[in-house]
Every structure is written in C-alpha cells, then in structure tokens.
Design a protein with these regions (language model features):
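Anaerobic metallocofactor- and corrinoid-dependent redox/one-carbon enzyme cores
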Residues: 2-32, 36, 41-44, 178-531
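Electropositive, gly/pro-rich neighborhoods at or near active sites that engage anionic ligands
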Residues: 43-201
Length: 531
C-alpha cells in the first residue's frame, strides 16, 4: 500500500478538512485507514447480497455490525484483524450469492463498492452519504453491546444493509436525505434496545457517589462501554484481592445494582479518553479496553494494555471470545498496585463524582421538577454532554457549566462530562444541580426525560425551558445527533467545531430547518439560551 489516506470522520481531523498523510490524528496509519475503506467496501457488497435467494441469518447481521463497529475511531489499529474481517465478509457474501463470483455476465450487482467514488463525489452527495455511513458506524456500536447481551432488533439489523446499500448507489440529495433521517429513527430504536438490554440485565441505575481515590493493593482499570465485559471481570476477580476501577465511559456502571453489588468495584480512575497516555504512564496496574477509545499506547505502559472484543492494537495482548481474563488478573497481581491509598482528583480538583441519574431516577421525582419549574425555582434545564477530545477550546464546556445560574439544572452524559463532573454545583429543590445520566447511549434516557416533561407540561420538547449544548468527537455522536434531528429537536449548540464532512449546503439545511448553531463563548451562549 502507498502511504496516502483520506479520513475525515472524527472531530480532530487535520485542519477540519481531513487526514491525508501517512497517519491520522487518531494514530491509525494510512494502511489501516485504507483497510478500513476496504472493509467498508466489502460490507457494502455484503449489503447488496442480502437481497439474494439465500436467507440472511443472525451471523450475517453480527458480522455486518462487527465490521462497522471496527471502523469507528479509536477502535482497531490492527491490519491483521481488519484483513481477517474482510475475508469473513467476502465469505459470507459468497454464501449468500454463491454463483455470483463465477457468473459470466458480470452485472456488478453484488460487487464491493469503490470508496474513492464516495470520497470524490459531489460535495453535497458526499456529505449526506458520510452522515449515513458515520451514523450507522456509531449505531453499530450500540447494536453490538445489545447483541452480546442477547438482544437484537430485526428492523435495526435490516437497516444496516439498507443504509450501506444506499451509500453504494448513484443517488442524489432527494433520495439520500430521507435515509439520513432514518439513521436517526433507527438509532432511537437501537438505543432503546440497548437500554432494555442493560436495565434488564443489571437493573435500573440509581444515584451513587464514586470515589476517585485508588486503594492500596492490586487493581485493574477497565475502560470502554461494555458492561458485559465488566460483569465478567468482576466475577472472575471475586475473592482474589484484586480491585476494579472504571475509566472513561465505564463510569456509569457504578449506578447499576447488579454491578455495584460487587464490593471490589471500588471507584473510578482518570478522566476522559484523550488523557490516557499521561494518566497510564506510571500506573502500577493493567488496563483493559473493551471498546473505544484506545489511543496508541506509549512504551511506558504498553506491556500493561489488554484489549478485547473489536478493540485491537498490534502486539497488544488480546482477550478472545472466551473472555478468560486470567492474563489481566495475573498482571494485576504481578504489578501489585499502590503501596498506600492514592488520592486522585478530577479536572477541577474534586475527589468524587456522581452518576446514576437515569430516566427512572429523574422521572421518579418528576413532580418535584415540574413544580420547581412552575414556581420558578428551576428557571432552565441544560443538557451539556457528548464526547470529549484534545482539541483546544473544549474548556468551553467547563466554563459554560461553571457559569450556569443557581436556578438552573445541568444534565450530562458521555465522556464530555469529565470537563466538569467533579464540580460541586450544589442542589436545587433537594436535587443535585448537576446530574450524570450515563454513557453516550444513555442519550435515550435524556430523551425520555425530555419527552416526559413535555407531556407533563402539555407542550413539545422545543417549548420546554431546555437547551442542548453538545460536544462531539466520533461516530456515535453522529447517530445521536441524527436521532435528535429525527425527533425534531431544534436550536442545538454543537462544538467545539462543526464536522468536516458536512458541506455548506447541508449545513445550511440543518441551520434553516433545525436551528443548529456552533458554540461561541460560554457567557454569550448562556445569555442567548436564557432569553
């Protein structure tokens, strides 16, 4: 392979235009980027073949979902595993259309797609197709998490094929725009499915205070989003004097009754994903990555990094489908942890954070919230959440939350909350002013809260004293944004930059129809939103 690539799917892409050199800002090489394109090409070919005479099955959807999830930012940096996936996709297509490869007519009906056609398409077509592609990549992560718990939705699965098929067709804006909005619709179903999977498996989250101090002795840090992997790790470390600490998007796990019942699930280590290379440098413990966001490990801690599921990095120890975490546990015992309790703080100096304010908790006190809004005790609600990242300017979200008036409430979710989740904003009406709803997929909970409040007031969500101030980084943020647009939610503030893959005409459509606006200065945006 040559050393040129093209990728503009994440917020940190070079110059807000695209990564085109020997490596992306995320750390993936040009060869990995081109293999991800090849995998996507093969997945479009597989989607085309799902209309064949041979019926698709659960394995078809499982492979399609895994392939899409593998191409999400900061998931896989491993050429070998991506090549293996490409071979599996081709084998599955051959099963669905066994006579296609030997057919003499060469109609091209089930061929893999040439991704260069997408990257070089007319800019508005490229923009809409990119929204579809990146949206279903993000949605695939949620479908994958639900799938490992035994939950699936046929309509969601079939939409993956429909969306991929659309990307491969020579369609214009009129045909593509409805598919873009359908990504939002199907992602809502997918998030509802994952919410059901998590809550039926682990109980409904309840508020909990999570310490940031790491106790002395051996421990393991688990990062990512997969609660199933955490559950298995907790079971395998029971009675072994090895404590478990969450990291990044795993923090909300502490709110689930079936997870927090384990006494050795002790607390949370570190902050958001982009700080891992600094925070893990001298960590006397192994780190297990269950999903994104993995950054290329530094030599100072590379021997302590373990991956599982779709996460993969060359020469890192990978835990296979049997989920036998013995090597991770042995590494924890070998390293021994800290000799004394080690206090840590969040970005703003707090020594504990709270989580677990899912829809059941907030709606359980909805009468108090409604009365407080009616009486004027609560003037406004903000949803400030989304992905964190390394680009300068993300301190906007810290300053925005700090400046919210005392008669307002801040709901948050996803790893963007680490910018401010250790702040003490006090209480209002007996409730914390700052409430962590959960992981990025728990946007479903936030949506249910907003819809329930709108119903209680007899108005639409857009008529509530509610503003959404969102940060984005990767593809799960794309599918969540499309879900909000599908629901007709308007006047969202988005930052720290607008996506490079959104063309001026598509952006103009979003501005005119949904009132999307970039963030500016915290004090200016607050002034506008509180009008």
């Amino acid at each position: 392979m040559d050393n040129k690539m093209f990728c503009f799917q994440c917020e940190q892409t070079v110059g807000c235009t695209g990564c085109t050199g020997k490596a992306g800002v995320c750390g993936k090489t040009a060869d990995v980027a081109k293999l991800q394109d090849e995998l996507t090409s093969a997945l479009i070919g597989l989607a085309r073949a799902t209309d064949g005479d041979t019926p698709v099955n659960a394995d078809t959807w499982r492979l399609m979902i895994k392939g899409l999830f593998t191409t999400v930012t900061n998931v896989s940096f491993n050429e070998k595993t991506i090549r293996e996936l490409i071979d599996r996709v081709h084998a599955e297509k051959e099963r669905l259309v066994p006579n296609c490869s030997s057919c003499g007519s060469r109609c091209g009906r089930n061929d893999d797609y040439d991704m260069n056609l997408l990257w070089n398409a007319q800019e508005d077509v490229r923009s809409l197709k990119s929204l579809i592609l990146f949206g279903v990549r993000g949605m695939a992560a949620y479908a994958h998490h639900a799938m490992v718990l035994g939950y699936a939705d046929e309509a969601v699965n079939r939409f993956f094929a429909k969306a991929l098929f659309a990307i491969g067709e020579d369609w214009g804006m009129d045909e593509l725009l409805p598919i873009v909005m359908e990504v939002g619709e199907k992602n809502l179903k997918c998030m509802a499915l994952l919410d059901k999977a998590n809550t039926e498996s682990y109980g409904m989250p309840t508020p909990v205070t999570v310490p940031l101090t790491v106790e002395k002795g051996p421990f393991i840090v688990i990062s990512g989003h997969d609660l199933h992997d955490l559950k298995l790790l907790l079971e395998q470390t029971k009675g072994k004097d090895v404590n478990i600490y969450t990291h990044g998007e795993m923090l909300p796990a502490h709110g689930y009754p079936e997870l927090k019942k384990y006494s050795h699930l002790k607390g949370n280590f570190g902050t958001a994903w982009q700080n891992q290379q600094k925070e893990f440098a001298e960590l006397p413990a192994p780190v297990l990555f269950t999903t994104n966001c993995l950054m290329p490990p530094k030599a100072s801690y590379a021997d302590r990094v373990f991956t599982t599921a779709v996460v993969s990095y060359p020469e890192m120890m990978h835990i296979g489908e049997d989920r036998d975490f013995t090597p991770v546990i042995e590494k924890a015992l070998e390293l021994g942890g800290y000799s004394e309790d080690k206090p840590f703080t969040g970005i703003n100096g707090g020594n504990a954070v709270m989580t677990g304010f899912a829809r059941s908790t907030v709606l359980g006190v909805a009468d108090r919230v409604i009365e407080a809004v009616k009486s004027g005790a609560i003037r406004h609600l903000f949803l400030v959440g989304g992905c964190d990242g390394a680009r300068p300017g993300r301190n906007y979200y810290t300053e925005f939350v700090k400046q919210t008036p005392a008669d307002t409430v801040v709901l948050t979710l996803a790893c963007g909350k680490y910018r401010f989740n250790d702040l003490d904003l006090g209480t209002i009406g007996g409730l914390p002013r700052l409430m962590d709803v959960g992981q990025c997929n728990d946007a479903y909970s936030a949506i249910q809260i907003a819809v329930a409040l709108a119903d209680a007031f007899g108005c639409g969500v857009n008529d509530l004293p509610l503003s959404m101030v969102l940060s984005w980084y990767e593809q799960k943020a794309v599918c969540i944004l499309l879900t909000l647009l599908y629901l007709g939610i308007k006047n969202i503030r988005l930052g720290p930059t607008l996506p490079a893959f959104v063309s001026p005409n598509v952006l103009n459509y979003l501005v005119e129809n949904f009132g999307i606006a970039p963030i500016t200065m915290p004090e200016e945006d607050l002034k506008q939103l509180l009008k």
